[in-house]
Regions:
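C-terminal motif of bacterial Sec signal peptides marking the signal peptidase cleavage site
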Residues: 6-9
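All-alpha RGS (Regulator of G-protein Signaling) helical domain and cognate RGS-like helical scaffolds
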Residues: 11-159
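Sec-dependent N-terminal signal peptides
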Residues: 1-2
C-alpha cells in the first residue's frame, strides 16, 4: 500500500460515493447550526442538567465538524442548504428572545428535532456510504444523538 505523506488518501482507500458526499455536505452545516444552538444554551440556560448535556455536546460537535469539513474541502463540494433537522433561523432567533424555563423548553424541542435529523442523516450514511471513517462517524452520531434525545426528553418532561 502506497500512501503519500501529505495526503489523507491511500491508494486502497475507496473513492467517496454520492452517499458519502451527501453525508458530509449535510452534516457540516448541521453541526454548525448545532454549535450555534449549543453556544446559545451555554449563555442562556440556567438548568444544570441542560447545561451539563450542552457541554458534552459541544466537544464532539466541534471535533466532528473539523473532521467532516476536511472532507468537504478535499472533495470540493458545497454544504447542503436543506437537510434533515434544519432549524429555521427565524425560529432560533425567537428562541433566543426567551428566558428561563420558556427558553429551555423551546430550545429542547428544537434540539430534539435537530438531533432527529442527524440520526436520519447518519442512518443513511450507515446504509449507503462506503468510506469506513465516515461510516464510523455516522454510527457515533446515531448512537450519541439518540441517547441525547432520550436525556433531553427527560429534561423536557420535568419542565
Amino acid at each position: 500500500m502506497l500512501c503519500v505523506a501529505a495526503s489523507t488518501a491511500c491508494s486502497n482507500q475507496p473513492q467517496p460515493n454520492s452517499a458519502d458526499k451527501t453525508f458530509v455536505a449535510e452534516m457540516v452545516p448541521h453541526h454548525q447550526i448545532g454549535i450555534d444552538m449549543i453556544n446559545s444554551a451555554v449563555l442562556r440556560s440556567d438548568d444544570v442538567r441542560l447545561r451539563k448535556l450542552v457541554f458534552q455536546m459541544q466537544s464532539y460537535h466541534e471535533h466532528e465538524l473539523h473532521e467532516l469539513s476536511s472532507h468537504l474541502q478535499q472533495w470540493k463540494i458545497s454544504s447542503a442548504k436543506i437537510f434533515p433537522g434544519l432549524i429555521d433561523p427565524n425560529r432560533l432567533a425567537k428562541i433566543d428572545e426567551l428566558t428561563g424555563p420558556a427558553y429551555d423548553i423551546a430550545w429542547l424541542k428544537a434540539m430534539i428535532e435537530h438531533h432527529n435529523g442527524a440520526v436520519a442523516i447518519g442512518k443513511m450514511q450507515m446504509k449507503l456510504g462506503q468510506i469506513p471513517s465516515l461510516i464510523d462517524v455516522a454510527k457515533k452520531v446515531v448512537t450519541t444523538q439518540q441517547a441525547e434525545i432520550i436525556e433531553m426528553q427527560k429534561i423536557l418532561a420535568e419542565k
